[in-house]
Protein backbone atom coordinates (compact mmCIF):
# COMPACT_ATOMS: atom_id res chain seq x y z
CA UNK A 1 0.00 0.00 0.00
CA UNK A 2 1.44 3.37 -1.02
CA UNK A 3 1.99 6.13 1.50
CA UNK A 4 -0.84 8.14 -0.08
CA UNK A 5 -3.21 5.15 0.20
CA UNK A 6 -2.26 4.69 3.84
CA UNK A 7 -2.88 8.37 4.54
CA UNK A 8 -6.28 8.28 2.79
CA UNK A 9 -7.25 5.19 4.80
CA UNK A 10 -6.18 6.83 8.07
CA UNK A 11 -8.12 10.02 7.29
CA UNK A 12 -11.20 8.04 6.28
CA UNK A 13 -10.98 5.99 9.48
CA UNK A 14 -10.76 9.15 11.60
CA UNK A 15 -13.74 10.69 9.77
CA UNK A 16 -15.77 7.54 10.40
CA UNK A 17 -14.76 7.18 14.07
CA UNK A 18 -15.67 10.78 14.87
CA UNK A 19 -18.96 10.66 12.96
CA UNK A 20 -17.77 13.42 10.64
CA UNK A 21 -18.10 11.30 7.51
CA UNK A 22 -21.87 11.01 7.98
CA UNK A 23 -22.18 14.74 8.67
CA UNK A 24 -20.20 15.50 5.51
CA UNK A 25 -22.38 13.13 3.48
CA UNK A 26 -25.52 14.85 4.76
CA UNK A 27 -24.07 18.28 3.99
CA UNK A 28 -23.15 17.14 0.48
CA UNK A 29 -26.58 15.63 -0.11
CA UNK A 30 -28.30 18.85 1.00
CA UNK A 31 -26.01 21.09 -1.09
CA UNK A 32 -26.49 18.95 -4.21
CA UNK A 33 -30.26 19.09 -3.86
CA UNK A 34 -30.16 22.83 -3.15
CA UNK A 35 -28.14 23.63 -6.29
CA UNK A 36 -30.30 21.47 -8.55
CA UNK A 37 -27.64 18.82 -9.22
CA UNK A 38 -29.95 15.99 -8.22
CA UNK A 39 -32.58 17.12 -10.73
CA UNK A 40 -29.93 17.43 -13.44
CA UNK A 41 -28.75 13.89 -12.70
CA UNK A 42 -32.31 12.54 -12.86
CA UNK A 43 -32.70 14.20 -16.26
CA UNK A 44 -29.43 12.63 -17.45
CA UNK A 45 -30.63 9.20 -16.32
CA UNK A 46 -33.91 9.65 -18.17
CA UNK A 47 -31.98 10.70 -21.27
CA UNK A 48 -29.79 7.58 -21.20
CA UNK A 49 -32.83 5.35 -20.66
CA UNK A 50 -34.68 7.05 -23.51
CA UNK A 51 -31.71 6.66 -25.88
CA UNK A 52 -31.10 2.98 -25.13
CA UNK A 53 -34.64 1.91 -24.35
CA UNK A 54 -35.78 0.80 -20.92
CA UNK A 55 -35.45 -2.88 -21.82
CA UNK A 56 -31.84 -2.44 -22.94
CA UNK A 57 -30.43 -0.49 -19.99
CA UNK A 58 -28.77 -2.05 -16.98
CA UNK A 59 -27.87 -0.25 -13.77
CA UNK A 60 -24.22 -0.61 -14.79
CA UNK A 61 -24.94 1.10 -18.14
CA UNK A 62 -26.68 3.92 -16.35
CA UNK A 63 -23.85 4.40 -13.86
CA UNK A 64 -21.23 4.28 -16.61
CA UNK A 65 -23.14 6.75 -18.77
CA UNK A 66 -24.00 9.24 -16.06
CA UNK A 67 -21.05 9.21 -13.62
CA UNK A 68 -18.56 11.33 -15.61
CA UNK A 69 -21.19 13.96 -16.44
CA UNK A 70 -22.56 13.86 -12.90
CA UNK A 71 -19.15 14.51 -11.39
CA UNK A 72 -18.54 17.37 -13.81
CA UNK A 73 -21.88 18.96 -12.86
CA UNK A 74 -21.00 19.26 -9.15
CA UNK A 75 -20.52 23.00 -8.62
CA UNK A 76 -17.03 24.14 -7.63
CA UNK A 77 -18.52 25.97 -4.65
CA UNK A 78 -19.83 22.67 -3.26
CA UNK A 79 -16.47 20.95 -3.80
CA UNK A 80 -14.64 23.84 -2.12
CA UNK A 81 -16.96 23.89 0.88
CA UNK A 82 -16.60 20.16 1.42
CA UNK A 83 -12.82 20.37 1.10
CA UNK A 84 -12.71 23.26 3.59
CA UNK A 85 -14.78 21.25 6.07
CA UNK A 86 -12.47 18.24 5.72
CA UNK A 87 -9.36 20.42 6.16
CA UNK A 88 -10.86 22.13 9.21
CA UNK A 89 -11.74 18.76 10.74
CA UNK A 90 -8.23 17.42 10.13
CA UNK A 91 -6.62 20.57 11.55
CA UNK A 92 -8.78 20.29 14.65
CA UNK A 93 -8.17 16.55 15.14
CA UNK A 94 -4.61 16.09 13.94
CA UNK A 95 -2.57 13.78 16.09
From Swiss-Prot:
Q: Which residues form a coiled coil?
A: none
What Gene Ontology terms for biological process does this UniProt record contain? Answer: chromatin organization; poly(A)+ mRNA export from nucleus; positive regulation of DNA-templated transcription; protein transport; regulation of transcription by RNA polymerase II; transcription elongation by RNA polymerase II
Q: Which domain of life is it from?
A: Eukaryota
Q: Which residues cross the membrane?
A: none
* Subcellular localization(s) per the UniProt record: Nucleus, Nucleoplasm
Query: Which Gene3D superfamilies does the record match to this protein?
Result: 1.10.246.140
Tell me, what is one Gene Ontology molecular-function annotation carried by this entry? chromatin binding
**What Pfam families does the record tag this protein with?**
EnY2
Keyword annotations of the record = Activator, Chromatin regulator, mRNA transport, Nucleus, Protein transport, Transcription, Transcription regulation, Translocation, Transport
Q: Name one GO cellular component term.
A: SAGA complex
Among PANTHER family, the record links this protein to:
ENHANCER OF YELLOW 2 TRANSCRIPTION FACTOR
Subunit annotation: Component of the nuclear pore complex (NPC)-associated TREX-2 complex (transcription and export complex 2). Component of the SAGA transcription coactivator-HAT complex. Within the SAGA complex, participates in a subcomplex of SAGA called the DUB module (deubiquitination module).
Q: Known HAMAP family for this protein?
A: ENY2_Sus1 (MF_03046)
Entry's family note? Belongs to the ENY2 family.
Q: What does this protein do?
A: Involved in mRNA export coupled transcription activation by association with both the TREX-2 and the SAGA complexes. The transcription regulatory histone acetylation (HAT) complex SAGA is a multiprotein complex that activates transcription by remodeling chromatin and mediating histone acetylation and deubiquitination. Within the SAGA complex, participates in a subcomplex that specifically deubiquitinates histones. The SAGA complex is recruited to specific gene promoters by activators, where it is required for transcription.
This chain belongs to which protein, by name? Transcription and mRNA export factor ENY2
Please name the source species: Danio rerio (Zebrafish)
Amino acid sequence: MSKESQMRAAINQKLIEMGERERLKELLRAKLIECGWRDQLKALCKEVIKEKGIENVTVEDLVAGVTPKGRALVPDSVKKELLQRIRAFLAQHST
